[in-house]
Amino acid sequence: MGIRIHRLRKQFETFTALDNIDLEVRQGELLALLGPSGSGKTTLLRIMAGLEHADGGQVLFGDEDATRMSVQSRRVGFVFQHYALFKHMDVFENIAFGLRVRRGNARWAEARIRARVEELLALVQLQGLEQRYPTQLSGGQRQRVALARALAIEPRVLLLDEPFGALDAQVRRDLRRWLRELHERTGLTTVFVTHDQEEALELADRVAILNRGRIEQLDTPAMIYDKPASPFVYSFVGAVNRIPGVLAQGQIQVAGHALPLANAALAAGPVEVYVRPEDLVPDQAGWPATVAWSQRSGSRLRLRATLEPSGNEVEVELPASAGSFQPGQQVRLAARQYGIFPA
């Protein structure tokens, strides 16, 4: 089931958390909400779940208006950053909790609850640990229990709030791969919040970049990285060089060289050229530059160079096989791809 957000607004006193957000999450999609602190990503997720209420706008699950629905009526699986497991319950009881608190006709028979929990233990690869308590589990195992508990109620959508934020780097990497495989098996519409760029770009089918309560760009990870829609996206996702230039008579003049202008709608005047370090390459037709320093890092070579005659410093990232560069060495650098925005 897909989710549609229409002109969603949320205000906390004088702070605008969400400013007329429009968003469509496709059925079966894994969507990341990525942005800095205060961008509105967690507020948006909590409104989807029914844990917060919007000041205006709509939340639709499929064709059903869920804007004023209770949390229970939405049938949403929600995973908190810090797991929110019950310490006095073992793994089995934690997973079964959402099924056991149901009342009336919604309550399952005990045999069905047990079968569902055993199915989920196999799905999240925790067979044999069902009698352990949360304090006896690793961080990664606790997160799997939290996911199994969210899935137990057979939710229509799955929402995750920074699911790997409390884990160390290696466990996060392992769990990312595992969650992607789990999503492929379940096909459940899933939205997760993160401030980790690598996590969003590796896991998601599409990424929504939020900033100051608005969506700056919604696109595939490849397009987010290669074709950022705004200076903010360029600067927030990955490293970038910003080089001042001027647009005049249909040409961009940057550091004494002309660059092709792809955006015909750009007005004449001062501009900034955004170039990622890996998109600057040695090329005899490029800008003259002087190497300030170089450093080998595994399979990559990082340089800092000063463009001439402008004096602008740029970071360059090359394959280690590109050779060695010494401070003071003269090079020429060309931009393979770049973005141009008004200064």
Swiss-Prot record:
Q: Where in the cell is it found?
A: Cell inner membrane
Q: Where does ATP bind?
A: G35, P36, S37, G38, S39, G40, K41, T42
Which reaction(s) does the protein catalyse, per the Swiss-Prot or TrEMBL entry? sulfate(out) + ATP + H2O = sulfate(in) + ADP + phosphate + H(+); thiosulfate(out) + ATP + H2O = thiosulfate(in) + ADP + phosphate + H(+)
**Per UniProt, what is one Pfam family of this protein?**
TOBE_3
- Per the record, what is one GO cellular component? ATP-binding cassette (ABC) transporter complex
- Which UniProt keyword terms apply here? ATP-binding, Cell inner membrane, Cell membrane, Membrane, Nucleotide-binding, Sulfate transport, Translocase, Transport
Q: Which residues form the ABC transporter domain?
A: 3-237
Gene3D superfamilies, per database record:
P-loop containing nucleotide triphosphate hydrolases
Provide the topology term for how it sits in the membrane.
Peripheral membrane protein
Q: What is its main location?
A: membrane
Instruction: Give the E.C. number(s).
Output: 7.3.2.3
SMART domains noted in UniProt: AAA
Decide whether keyword ATP-binding is in the record: yes
Q: Which GO terms describe its molecular function?
A: ABC-type sulfate transporter activity; ABC-type thiosulfate transporter activity; ATP binding; ATP hydrolysis activity
What quaternary arrangement does the UniProt entry report?
A: The complex is composed of two ATP-binding proteins (CysA), two transmembrane proteins (CysT and CysW) and a solute-binding protein (CysP).
Tell me which NCBIfam families the record gives.
3a0106s01
Family in the record: Belongs to the ABC transporter superfamily. Sulfate/tungstate importer (TC 3.A.1.6) family.
Functional note: Part of the ABC transporter complex CysAWTP involved in sulfate/thiosulfate import. Responsible for energy coupling to the transport system.
This one is known as Sulfate/thiosulfate import ATP-binding protein CysA
Species annotation? Xanthomonas axonopodis pv. citri (strain 306)
Q: Which gene encodes it?
A: cysA
